[in-house]
Swiss-Prot record:
Keywords: Cytoplasm, FAD, Flavoprotein, NAD, tRNA processing. This is tRNA uridine 5-carboxymethylaminomethyl modification enzyme MnmG. GO terms for molecular function: flavin adenine dinucleotide binding. PANTHER family: GLUCOSE INHIBITED DIVISION PROTEIN A, PROTEIN MTO1 HOMOLOG, MITOCHONDRIAL. GO terms for biological process: tRNA methylation; tRNA wobble uridine modification. It comes from Wigglesworthia glossinidia brevipalpis. It holds the Pfam family GIDA. Its cofactor is FAD. The keyword tRNA processing applies.
Amino acid sequence: MCSCYKEIDIIIVGGGHAGTEAAAVAAKMKCNTMLITQNIDTIGQMSCNPSIGGIGKGHLVKEIDAMGGIMGIAADNSGIQFRTLNSSKGPAVRATRAQIDRKLYSSLIQKILSNQKNLYLLQQEVIDILVEKNKIKGVVTNAGLIIKSKIVIITTGTFLNGKIHIGNKQYVSGRSGEFSSIKLSQILKEKFCFRINRLKTGTPPRIDLKSVNFSKLESQYGDTPIPQFSFMKFVGIRPKQLPCYITYTNKNTHNIIIDNIKHSPIYNGSIKGIGPRYCPSIEDKVVRFSKKESHQIFLEPEGLNNYEIYPNGISTSLPLNLQIKIIRSIKGLESANITRPGYSIEYDFLDPRDLKLTLESKIISGLFFAGQINGTTGYEEAAAQGLLSGINAALMLKNGSFWFPKRSQAYLGVLIDDLCTLGTKEPYRMFTSRSEHRLIIREDNADLRLTEIGRKLGIIEDDRWNNFYNKKNIIYKEIKNLKNTKILFNKEEKNKINLNINKSGSITAEEILRRPEITYNDLICYNFIKRKLKDEEIIKQIEIQIKYAGYIKRQEKEINKKTYYDNIILPNEINFKKISGLSKEVIEKLNIFKPTSIGQAIKISGITPAAISIILIWLKKNNLMYNK
């Protein structure tokens, strides 16, 4: 072995969506950072669907952008169709989703990283980690390189002991056509005793664009004006916008699957890993929803200069000959040719309960994990974890501090709290329904929630900060102006817009805007106010803050109650067996989950209010009642 590199501050293992965010933010925080990946050309690659965002996921992308991350900007510059989902519903569940030119996206990510100061790229496979006295010291590569570092972040995605299944064929791979990382998985499990389990995910076959009969299909176009992920104004020329197309499976499709279900690795026992509940294979859909006559399929373009179509909704691991039959049984795809077969992939993942909320390991100091290795599914969940791990790795080096958002601050807070407190037995996907504070942590206010924090952490550059600061001031001043603008009505005007006003015949502009049917622009049309803001995003923000003020205050009161328990620390060295009055079940669960606060302990199934009271009394009695 040879050691020909000077000591690096932070090493990131893996160049996917978690690894790229971790590398970018760590380098931005002036740490000497190295990203090691098996193939530099596939950095930032979209392994499965050519899209970013969606319900819950779009919220994460907005939060990443608000904190100075790179996914949002890259998506805005490579998007070929943008839509706002749930646009007719309330602001809490509205979400941005974009179809992405996958080649353009990865090239943009690579360009951002190549231009980032303090960041070095290395094409190698990491096969071991160096540890002394439970502290990380570096990594070992397959070429025999020893690279010393103060911190290591592992972001291996599905590559950790990955195995691909197509029918009865199986082969070791981290992604189709790429090597799996077997030795690193063995080291983590056998040498360092991490709890390692198996998960499974899948992808549909790709279809030759030229072989699709689009005249038989329903078109779906993007929104105008085009929504975006980044809070920075888009500058430049957008890529050409393309439609998606909709088709459906049918009785013939379902019969092919049912008649050949024994050839599915999911149903013949070949696959042991648990797959994503909210992104099931077409085999699962047909079996589990047997009374359903059809399933919707979205035919999504893979890019402007790409000849392939991604059929979203028919992930499968059936043999290739059956995949062809299934595809050709569908309207518009009767003559379709498959360019790449669909497959399922099993891979190892780490039990996230072995991690702190910073995503640092509880077992080895200075070792972080982020992305699918922690049991999540999706680019957005991975990228959010990468950002958090990179921030905390840099903070640890600088002054030993740390940062993570609470559940009431961000969907990222919900994500890490769910994972690190409760763990997961299936690929974890973010939804707005996972948050009990979704009216507070909306897509539209991600910058108002997080950009100031990012500035304090040193990851928000001046142009973004100035943009945010101006926006925040405009919103604050305009809401104040609306509250102070009193309007006098005569009887005719009052009846015209059906207003209930007080006896004096006056009402503020803010009170009028509270009404659900009144918009900010209505105030101008009725000559209630003379000024006019031009920025539609600022106008929307003002409307939301005023119209939902009562509901928001109610949620804030609930948050304050929960914060008390979240702030009471449970010391690492606490021995729950010594706390008299706790049942064996409670002690067992506390030792398994290892909560770091009373707030975390409360969320564990089986931990009773009585048990929490006993622990609180014990902490007070032993002078261990510390707040964060």
